[in-house]
Amino acid sequence: ENLMGIKRKKGSMQSGKKPILINHLKQIINVIDEEKIEKIKKLRNRTIILIGFGGGFRRTELISIDYEDIDFVQEGVKITLRRSKTDQFGEGLIKGLPYFTNEKYCPVTSLKNWLHLSKIKTGPIFKRFAKGSILTKHRLTDQSVVLIIKECLNIAGVENKNFSGH
């Protein structure tokens, strides 16, 4: 019991997973663009990855984003998070993402393209697909995001056992 108290007070080194680095991100996006799957699925997956990476979003934050939480501004996009693990008092928080010079890796451009192609105008922006490429009304789960990221890492040839979602 005393040791646990000391550990909590002093802290201990975490043996966490590695973060995805920019070179991995580019590999993943390049591979997604080459994939032989429906355009709408490619665009959803690349948007999840670019928004997640660009804004440092947790999986649960990504899947909680609704259309009503998005505000496109001249500089990029503001995304309101109603709840977050880091928002201890439940006040909500706004994350801003700027436009990137290179559109291919720009989370804002990808988000705009996703919303246009998916025709989402309300509710969750990251939804599940039914058989084929039919978008459902159901929000993705955080586990779905894990599977999408791991699959993309695998296809990109990046060893995925050392990575985990935020």
Report residues per predicted region:
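Extended, non-catalytic subsegments within catalytic or DNA/protein-binding/adaptor domains
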Residues: 1-166
